[in-house]
Curated annotation (Swiss-Prot):
Gene3D superfamilies: Ribosomal protein L21 (2.30.30.70). One of its GO terms (biological process) is translation. It comes from Methanospirillum hungatei JF-1 (strain ATCC 27890 / DSM 864 / NBRC 100397 / JF-1). GO terms for molecular function: structural constituent of ribosome. One of its GO terms (cellular component) is ribonucleoprotein complex. It comes from the Archaea. PROSITE patterns: RIBOSOMAL_L21E. Belongs to the eukaryotic ribosomal protein eL21 family. Keywords: Ribonucleoprotein, Ribosomal protein. This is Large ribosomal subunit protein eL21. The lineage of its organism: Archaea, Methanobacteriati, Methanobacteriota, Stenosarchaea group, Methanomicrobia. InterPro entries: Ribosomal_eL21, Ribosomal_eL21_arc, Ribosomal_eL21_CS, Ribosomal_eL21_sf, Translation_prot_SH3-like_sf.
Amino acid sequence: MALHNGPRKKTRYKFKKDLRSRGVLPVTRVIQQFELGQKVHIVCEPSIQKGMPHRRFHGKTGSVVGQRGRAWLVEIRDGNKFKTVISRPQHLRAQQF
């Protein structure tokens, strides 16, 4: 078989949704707002491809450092480096204390 290198390769189980959570996404997830410095989890929403971060950042936690259009800038720690991930709010969830 040919080797394919698309952005969603190796995500067969990582991006799979629960049977009860399938269907249309609530509007509140699309229009949610975050504050600067707020902790958020990057959880990719597989039904919406636009504004989805790379699969290596799925499950990471970071802090919001800014906004770029409709997307949010999230700073995460990757080893000893800090990286900035651009993601739409559908793929972010606020951390609950």
